[in-house]
Curated annotation (Swiss-Prot):
Record keywords: Cell cycle, Cell division, Cell membrane, Cell shape, Cell wall biogenesis/degradation, Magnesium, Membrane, Metal-binding, Peptidoglycan synthesis, Transferase, Transmembrane, Transmembrane helix
One GO CC annotation: plasma membrane
HAMAP family xref list: MraY (MF_00038)
Annotated Pfam families: Glycos_transf_4, MraY_sig1
Gene name as annotated: mraY
A GO molecular-function annotation: UDP-N-acetylmuramoyl-L-alanyl-D-glutamyl-meso-2,6-diaminopimelyl-D-alanyl-D-alanine:undecaprenyl-phosphate transferase activity
EC number: 2.7.8.13
Official protein name in the record: Phospho-N-acetylmuramoyl-pentapeptide-transferase
Statement: the UniProt record of this protein carries the keyword Cell membrane: yes
GO terms under biological process: cell division; cell wall organization; peptidoglycan biosynthetic process; regulation of cell shape
Membrane topology: Multi-pass membrane protein
Lineage summary: Bacteria, Pseudomonadati, Pseudomonadota, Gammaproteobacteria, Enterobacterales
Transmembrane segments annotated in the record for this chain: 27-47, 73-93, 94-114, 130-150, 168-188, 199-219, 235-255, 263-283, 291-311, 339-359
Substrates-to-products reaction catalysed: UDP-N-acetyl-alpha-D-muramoyl-L-alanyl-gamma-D-glutamyl-meso-2,6-diaminopimeloyl-D-alanyl-D-alanine + di-trans,octa-cis-undecaprenyl phosphate = di-trans,octa-cis-undecaprenyl diphospho-N-acetyl-alpha-D-muramoyl-L-alanyl-D-glutamyl-meso-2,6-diaminopimeloyl-D-alanyl-D-alanine + UMP
Cofactor(s) this protein requires: Mg(2+)
Amino acid sequence: MLVWLCEKLVYLYSGFNVFSYLTIRSIISLLTSFFLSLFFGPRVILFLKKFQIKQIIRLDGPKSHLYKCNTPTMGGVMILVSVIFSVLSWSHLSNSYIWYVLYVLTGYGIIGFFDDYKKIINKNSQGLKAKWKYIWQSIIAISISVFIFLKYQNTNATKLVIPFFKDIMPQLGLWYILLSYFVIVGSSNAVNLTDGLDGLAIMPTVFISAGLAIIAWVTGNINFSSYLNIPYIKFSGELVIICTSIIGSGLGFLWFNTYPAKIFMGDVGSLSLGGALGIISVLTRQEILLFIMGGVFVLETISVILQVIFFKISGQRIFKMAPIHHHYELRGCPEPRLIVRFWIISFILVLLGISTLKVR
């Protein structure tokens, strides 16, 4: 939107040409979404408090969480608005990859919105039935996966990139649809499961978005992708704008979500951000790297799966409570310390993921 305007104004003043550079636009998009989040934050918090849109606490959860019952939720709407506005302002809207991500981001945001809304109306922690949530997530993930496969099949956009191996890049064929589906849905639900402590989910999301921004920039640059022996994907460079918009909005949200949180993102935020990370990794062909960089999310998800399976088999629990961050809480680890430790782990995993681009 603003990029298009600047391109028109360059004939009047050559200085507007600076907005044609991806690096400049990525920095501006980060700042735009950051300051929008800071601007909306206090206003959204007051609005949510006024209409009693507050967090519903699980009665079987840690007792230390009971004080959070009056904390406003659905703050993810603030994140979505900031990200979408920044992306529409500073990206080339003719780039189809931008719209693929916005489709998933918005679609999963709507699912999360209705999930949060139902929790608030029913005044319990049970929102949409798991079956219906999964069905709608699947519809969005399958539809975008099929569309991308039909449009880009047998190109670099449908190859499987394996870290550490520069010569092994098989064409996935129809397996592309299945892999993309699991990555998008899995990433969305993994972030959702992790979002149980103040700032626990948003900071790893920011770190991973930074990692994906570097990956998108390299993948969309024919010289760097050739140097690093990764597939060149023509349109992926513009995804940097989405990544930096998520970074800015996430940091702005963290301003109010850090311990003790004044607002929670709710499912409207966690489902949409997780879905966005998933589709970006699919479009840049770095699904395996997302698994590495998102190790905190993976750990949280595996802990839930193991807890459920082990309980059904033996009637006993592996952890005091799942996801695993609740286990450490119940063992006496203070929430702020636990959050920062997970942040540190996430940061290290993102650095590890980025380093694999060179180690091939």
